[in-house]
Amino acid sequence: SHEVTSWIRNMLRAWEADLTARAPAEEKQQVFKAEKAQYRQSKQYLKPLRRALRDGEVDAGVIFSLAEIAKDSGQRRYRAAKEAYMRLAIGNHPWPMGVTFVTFHDRAARHKIGEGAQAHVLDDETTRKYVQMVKRLVTFAERRWPIDPTQEE
């Protein structure tokens, strides 16, 4: 969990440094304002995760996935990091038969199937937010430190 905490801290610091290093003329642009708002939101939504990691309240499987994302992102293996994110977000659960053909009206009772069994970590709102912010950090890292095109993943 220490690796995950330090990766999050380092990514947020790098993002903040990247924003403050921008030209003053750029601060008026809408794109810059949007990115600054994304940074603030990410920092805010990641607080519960950082607190839970510090207090040891995060599930071992989630810590493993987050560590995998942090390691892959740190080594600029962004495709692997995104795959680890997808496994964390939706898991490896196969879709039920015919789920691609479900219409709006079929949904009424279908949501009760398997009720009670948590399918993936995104069922909790706070967890959903910080998992999405982890993906945002990977996207920032990919923009900030792009992979060398001569080295294929």
Q: Locations of the language-model features?
A:
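Acidic, serine/threonine- and proline-rich intrinsically disordered low-complexity regions
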Residues: 1-51
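Generic surface-pattern signal
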Residues: 13, 17-20, 24, 54, ...
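Short, solvent-exposed segments of well-ordered alpha helices
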Residues: 29, 33-36, 57-60, 121, ...
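Helix-boundary capping/turn motifs
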Residues: 37-44, 57-62, 74
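Extended amphipathic alpha-helical scaffold segments
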Residues: 51-57
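Predominantly eukaryotic Lys/Arg-rich, low-complexity intrinsically disordered regions
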Residues: 64-153
